[in-house]
Design a protein with these regions (language model features):
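Glycine- and aromatic-enriched low-complexity segments, predominantly in secreted/extracellular proteins
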Residues: 20-133
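Classical secretory targeting signals
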Residues: 1-22
């Protein structure tokens, strides 16, 4: 009886986590539906890094790189809000996200999210002078 209860509890928890993950991916799609995200592009990419569920499978070195990238995204968002552009730091972030999006230990869906984020940042790099703030 206890074993059945324990298994049932684990299954319910797993379904709950799966539903929450699905909601996050749906919410992410909604966030990027129109152009309002542009003023907060670095903040949104950082949120994506915070929610990547498969990062725990990555190597310590990869997790440290992702943490450093989160910090750089915060810096870039602050600079953007001040009207400043830092191409060097942006290139570092793009390189880091590119490496992460190619890491086989991350789930394919999480790699797709990182690849999409990389494309958004490359678009910003190319058009930052005309980017909506």
């Amino acid at each position: 009886m206890r074993w059945t209860f324990a298994v049932g509890t684990v299954l319910v928890a797993a379904l709950g986590f799966s539903a929450a993950a699905q909601d996050w991916y749906h919410d992410r799609d909604e966030r990027f539906r129109d152009e309002h995200w542009r003023a907060h592009v670095f903040e949104h990419v950082r949120t994506d890094l915070d929610h990547i569920g498969s990062a725990w499978r990555a190597a310590d070195r990869e997790r440290r790189r992702l943490e450093r990238t989160r910090e750089e995204l915060g810096d870039l968002q602050a600079k953007m809000e001040q009207g400043r552009y830092d191409g060097g730091e942006l290139n570092d972030v793009i390189d880091s996200l590119t490496k992460s999006s190619n890491d086989e230990r991350l789930s394919p869906r999480d790699r797709d999210v990182l690849h999409d984020d990389t494309n958004r940042l490359m678009d910003y790099r190319e058009h930052h002078d005309h980017w909506a703030r």
